[in-house]
Amino acid sequence: MAKRITGSTPKLDGYRMPAEFEPQAGVWMLWPERNDNWRDGAKPAQKAFLDVATAILQFEPVTVCVSPAQYQNARERLPRAVRVVEMASNDAWIRDCGPTFLVNDNGGVRAVDWTFNAWGGLVDGLYFPWDLDDQVAQKVCEIERVDSYRTEGFVLEGGSIHVDGEGTVLTTEMCLLSEGRNPDKSKEEIEQMLCNYLGCEKVLWIKDGIDPDETNGHIDDVACFIAPGEVACIWTEDKNHPFYEQAQAAYKFLSEATDAKGRKLKVHKLCLTKKPCLLEGADTIDAVEGTIPREDGEVSIASYMNFLIVNGAVILPQYGDENDAVAIEQGRKM
């Protein structure tokens, strides 16, 4: 039985968010199916999610949450070792709408259940409604029997934060200060919420992300802690690249920053794609009221930085770009 914890915060109770490079018990995923978001009836997306789940499974357990309509399809396609759980959601981004797990020094595990509003709510969110996504974190906590803290009304997605596990949070002003998140709170108040609910002491604010239109600039496309005192950061020397200015600014900021322990950060460069990735097949995506329409030629946010660290490996995205191999080699050297 999982309970809601009220009248306290994770920091007061001795809990912190662990870094992504710390040991993991498993990975949770959501299964894509929205015809108004994914092309070709979500079949290419399902194949990609299947490949990701299969790759992760080599290193740790995987649970995939699936709607009732897709349960049989997902169960038959996913490896038998993958746990498939029937769960309703509005889309497939559990990193953003799922729980932020916490640990303490005695092996205890808890979680934060942030309020989720589809990356901007009625201001600039990607779809409406989002109520099922906002229930995902609590459902996962119930299944895992993990007690949780609910930040009712305080909006945050998992992809908007990275931590080093030693007191430092990494985020962007573009996202957390956006009008569609927490417009009633100042930067200082948001920073205090991050420290209280992630068990941290210092927040590093990169100014801009590379995705202003969909996630409002999530940090997981820009930079990530890979070890205590070390971060990876997107990089390009191509002044014509659409993300050149953001990459240069982020690298400069991190190169001059120190973490919560006072260490000057060691910054590793991770290349961007050689060419921008452009959306194709928009005519196979359904147009539905309440959802932002897709158009051919839109710049897709293709960032090698949006990798996943698992136990003993890194699952790094590939885009059919000539820099795919470069990114793999750079990742291996980190």
Q: What is the predicted role of each segment?
A:
Residues 1-334:
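Histidine/cysteine-enriched polar flanking segments
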